[in-house]
Amino acid sequence: YNNTGGGGGFATGTLAVTGGQVLRISAGEGGYGVINPSPNPQGQSATEFFGAGPGSTGGAGIAGVFTTNSSTPTCHSAPGVYMVAGGGGGSGGFASGIDGGVGGGTIGGAGGGDGATAQANNNGPQECSGGGGSQTAGGQSLAAGPQTSAPQITNGAFLQGGSGSYGGAGGGYYGGGAGGRPGNQSPGDRVGAGGGGSSYVGHPQITCGSTEAGEACMSSGGSPDP
């Protein structure tokens, strides 16, 4: 099987700035997929990018324009966020057709299938895949199954993807949810993909703002734009 991480979202708009104003820019890092037989989704080290949630297949980080330190998500508040392009979720594994959810649009894609179904704060369309982030809430993360070593499961949140054992969540204005695994955790069970994060252009100083969701097969939104 060959599953891909979700394509990143796209955000555009005009920001009027003043002399001496300092803006900090975050360039989003792409998420990860998995190709059978290697690497094993459980065997990969979890790489965590700015705003992305940890998981066996990494979700993509946030691309955005901020007024505060863009290396630490907890340092931000909503008034200091001008624009965000949501990151795609990491893929699932052990079966085909479990791609990571795409970055939004106003709503990130839920993990599973081709990852392009916009679905906010809910389970993904495939078993145990994470939901996409919206403008007001993060995507839902799925349980990791009966593992004594499973990390804490958290849903997506403001500027932060959810955490889990499997498909990593994409970062965004509100991050996606992490993928889980069925409760019986039998060998060969499907591993859920992470949901994508939402994009944002709603700051009052942004004019002519618009967003575009990513596409299946890791194609980013806004690809015709420079």
Predicted regions and their residues:
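Secretome/extracellular-domain signature
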Residues: 3-129, 139, 143-145
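N-terminal targeting/export leaders
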Residues: 121-123, 129, 138, 194, ...
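Short consensus segments that form the blades of beta-propeller domains
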Residues: 2-4, 52-56, 164, 185-192
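Extended serine/threonine-enriched, polar tracts that run as long, contiguous segments within proteins
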Residues: 146-165, 178-179, 183
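C-terminal subregion of chymotrypsin/trypsin-like serine protease catalytic domains
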Residues: 178-226
